[in-house]
């Protein structure tokens, strides 16, 4: 399939650059298994999910991963921490007027904390901080909100660009699992009262989630690598859910990629798994675990649009997106949501 097969026109004013006042106040577009779409409020999810179904959510936490600083010569630089290798060494993106070389010393924060470039790892820099990374990020970092917000991170993002159920010990993402941003505590309690179970996986979202596809034939695209964990407790709940004929509902493309990666690693069966994944899901992929997906509206020609097109199909998705544009749904990370059923 060609990259252009996944293009659509999106008016700039439909990009949601700030969250709504209430998390669960978003709209929801339900795309059913036959390709028909239906307009809802997000809280209607209570009526669209059945007793005994299982929600799978990503419990990662977003780091304040963006640091502004300078070279020893005084030139401005920006560091985005992609992955911590240990307490003081990380893989990073670095923006600078000239590419830093191994041995270059950079300085961040008011006290000029030293960051030494050790070398390269693929398209990333390997750097060593003179102090513990999380401490530096906590003091001087900014939340790495998406580039299409066209603004700096603000105080509202500190709360609203995190899920209400994130695990504070799992602080390693550079982007939020945005489908989960619609869930507030009240909605989660109402889902539990209806006997809709929830469980968690972890996928630490990398900056590659924002990288454009640069190949005309999508099969030639190489996915970025992200670390994920599907614990045995989650795998067991999924097996039980499937055994009684209920649905597994992934909340977000990150949860989807974690679940399907675990299944691929275990011969198509869901089992516990931890590791790096580069899974690329596009039309033709046969899902092993996920029956339904709650997700936001995605960018044209993005791998995430290809993923949702694999669960339904490309024509269904593009038709639903056309309706969403005409109906002025809000798009992207702070936007509205879809509930997508696997096409029959």
Curated annotation (Swiss-Prot):
Keyword terms, alphabetized: Cytoplasm, Queuosine biosynthesis, S-adenosyl-L-methionine, Transferase
Species annotation: Acinetobacter baylyi (strain ATCC 33305 / BD413 / ADP1)
Enzyme class: transferase
UniProt subcellular location: Cytoplasm
Pathway(s) the chain acts in: tRNA modification; tRNA-queuosine biosynthesis
UniProt keyword S-adenosyl-L-methionine present: yes
Coiled coil regions in record: none
Gene it is expressed from: queA
Protein name: S-adenosylmethionine:tRNA ribosyltransferase-isomerase
Annotated Gene Ontology cellular component terms: cytoplasm
A biological process term (GO) from this entry: tRNA wobble guanine modification
SUPFAM superfamilies assigned to the protein according to its UniProt record, in alphabetical order: QueA-like
GO molecular function: S-adenosylmethionine:tRNA ribosyltransferase-isomerase activity
Pfam families: Queuosine_synth
Main location: cytoplasm
EC nos: 2.4.99.17
Family classification: Belongs to the QueA family.
């Amino acid at each position: 399939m060609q990259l252009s097969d996944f293009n659509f026109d999106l008016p700039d004013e439909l990009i949601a650059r700030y969250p709504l006042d209430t998390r669960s106040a978003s709209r929801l577009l339900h795309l059913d298994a036959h390709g028909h779409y239906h307009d809802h409020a997000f809280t209607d999810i209570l009526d669209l999910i059945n007793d005994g179904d299982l929600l799978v959510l990503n419990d990662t936490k977003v780091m304040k991963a963006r640091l502004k600083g300078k070279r020893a010569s005084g030139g401005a630089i920006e560091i985005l921490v992609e992955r911590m290798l240990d307490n003081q060494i990380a893989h990073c993106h670095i923006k600078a007027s000239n590419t830093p070389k191994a041995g270059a010393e950079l300085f961040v924060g008011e006290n000029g904390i030293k960051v030494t470039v050790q070398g390269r790892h693929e398209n990333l820099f390997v750097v060593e901080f003179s102090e513990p990374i999380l401490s530096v990020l906590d003091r001087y970092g900014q939340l790495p909100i998406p580039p299409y917000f066209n603004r700096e991170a603000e105080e509202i993002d500190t709360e609203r660009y995190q899920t209400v159920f994130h695990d504070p010990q799992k602080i390693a993402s550079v982007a939020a699992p945005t489908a989960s941003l619609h869930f507030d505590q009240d909605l989660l309690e109402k889902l539990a009262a209806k006997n809709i179970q929830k469980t968690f996986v972890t996928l630490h979202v990398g900056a590659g989630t924002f990288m454009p596809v640069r190949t005309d034939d999508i099969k030639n695209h190489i996915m970025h690598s992200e670390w994920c964990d599907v614990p045995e407790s989650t795998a067991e709940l999924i097996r039980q859910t499937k055994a009684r004929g209920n649905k597994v509902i992934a909340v977000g493309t990150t949860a989807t990629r974690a679940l399907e990666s675990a299944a691929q690693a275990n011969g198509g069966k869901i089992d516990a798994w931890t590791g790096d994944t580069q899974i690329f899901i596009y039309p033709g992929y046969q899902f092993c675990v996920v029956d339904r997906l709650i997700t936001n509206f995605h960018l044209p020609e993005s791998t995430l649009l290809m993923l949702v097109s694999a669960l339904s199909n490309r024509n269904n998705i593009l038709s639903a997106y056309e309706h969403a544009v005409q109906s002025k749904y809000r798009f992207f990370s702070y936007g509205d949501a879809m509930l997508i059923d696997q096409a029959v």
